[in-house]
Amino acid sequence: MANVVGTNTCVAVQDTNLVGTNTYVAVQETNIVGQDPITNEELYILKRDGSKEILSFDKILKRVKALGTETKPHLNVNYSQLVMKVVDQLYNTMPTYVIDELTAEQCASLITKHLDYGTLASRIIVSNNHKNTLASFAVTMDKLYHFKDIHGLHSPLIHKDVWELSQKNAAFFQSIIDYSRDYLLDYFGFKTLERAYLMKIGKKVVERPQHMWLRVALGIHGADLERVSETYELISQKYFTHATPTLFNAGTNHPQLSSCYLIAMEEDSVDGIYNTLKDCAKISKWAGGIGLHVHNVRAAGTHINGTNGVSNGLSPMLRVFNTTARYIDQGGGRRAGSFAIYLEPWHADIEAFLDMKKNHGDEEMRARDLFYSLWIPDLFMEKVKKDEDWCLFCPHKCPGLADCYGAAFNALYEKYRLEGKANKTVKARTLWFKILDSQMETGTPYLLYKDQANKKSNQQNLGVIKSSNLCVAPETQILTDQGYFEIK
C-alpha cells in the first residue's frame, strides 16, 4: 500500500478507498510521492536502467495521460482515479514495467465502464513492450541467433538463413517495419501474443509484434524480399494472419508451419497403438493439431489371441492419448495439445465413446481433454429416420467396414448383420439421442458424414477418406476456377 503525500498546490482527487462516488480528498498536484504506511519511509520505483527513483504520482499520471491524449482519438477516461487505484497497490522498488502492467490491468478491468479504458490498456501495454525491447529488427534477430543456453553453448532460436538475411538487408527491413501498427492490437490480443507467440530469451520477451510479423514473412519467403514486404504489409495491418504453428515456428530451426494432421491408427496392436501415440506426440510438440481415426481398434471384450485375454476397448486407450495431449503440449508449454478422435457409429464401443467427455460418471472411463467426432454413414441416418435397429460390430471380427462407403458399405454391413456377427443391436434413434445428449452436455461429438465426404472427394483414386481434421466448420469454403464456394 502506498500513501500519497507531498507539498505544494492541492487539487481534488476522488478517494477510491472511501465508500461512495462523490467523496473527494485533497492531494498535492506536484511532487506527490509515496510513503510506506507502516514505516513512513519513502517508496522507490526501479527504473528500466536499474536505477531507483522516488515514487511520483505525477509521473505515473503524466505517462498515462500522454498515452491517452497524444494519439487520436483522445480517450474519455478518469486518469486521476485510475492512477490512484494503481498507486494504492504499489510496493517499494516495484519495477516500472510492472507498474505499466498493473496500470493496463486496471484499465482492462474498467472496460465495462467505458470502452476507452480498453484502448488505453492496449496503448499502455504496447508502450511497455516497446520500452522493454529493441527498435531494430536486425539487432533483435541477432540476439535470438546468438542465444546461449544455461551451459554457455550456442543455441540459436532462429535459423541461420533467416539471421543472415536479417543482417544483410537490415536497412531494408528497418525501412518497411512500422511499430505504430502494434497499437492496432487490443489489450487481450497483445497479452495472448506476449504469453505464447512473441519470442523470449529466458522469460524475457525480446520481440515486438512487428518483429514477429516480419520474422514470419521472412521465414516463409526467404530471400524474395518483394514477397516478404508484401506479406508483412498485409499481416501487420490485420488483413489476415497465419495459424499458430506458423507464428510459433516460422524462421526458427524447426519451421513446422502446418496446422492440422490426419492420422490413422497404425494397427490394432500394442506396437501399432504406441507408434501412433509417438507420432501424435511429435506432431503436438511442434504445434500441430491432430485428427485421429480409431475405427480399426477392437472393441472391449474382444478375445486377444496372443495373450488369451480380452481387450479393454477404446476408453483406456484414449485416456493414454488424453494424457499425452496434456503432457506434450504445443511449443513447450505455449498451448495445450489438441487431438480429435474419430469413430464410426457401428463400432461396439460407441456408447462408451459418447461418454468420454462428460463431467460425471466413472473417472477411469473419462478423457475430457480430447475432442470427439463421429464419421457417420448415410445408412445410420436412414435407420434413425425410420426408427429401425442398428447393429454394433467389433472391427476385429467384422473387418472392412471403415474401408468402404456408399453401396459397398451398406452391403458389407448387411452381410455381417445376417451372419449374426453384431456385438449388440440397439435402436438407431436411441443411439442418436445419446449423441445429441452428449452434444448438449459437452459440445461434442462433431458430426461428419462419411458417404458425402467420399463422394465429393477429388482423390477417390487414393482410397477411402476415414476422418477429417481437428477443426470442423460448416462454413468451410473450397477454391474452384469460379471462385470460393461453401461445402454443401
Regions inferred by a protein language model and the residue ranges of each:
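Extended catalytic cores of very large enzyme megasubunits
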Residues: A2-D15, G20-E475, K488
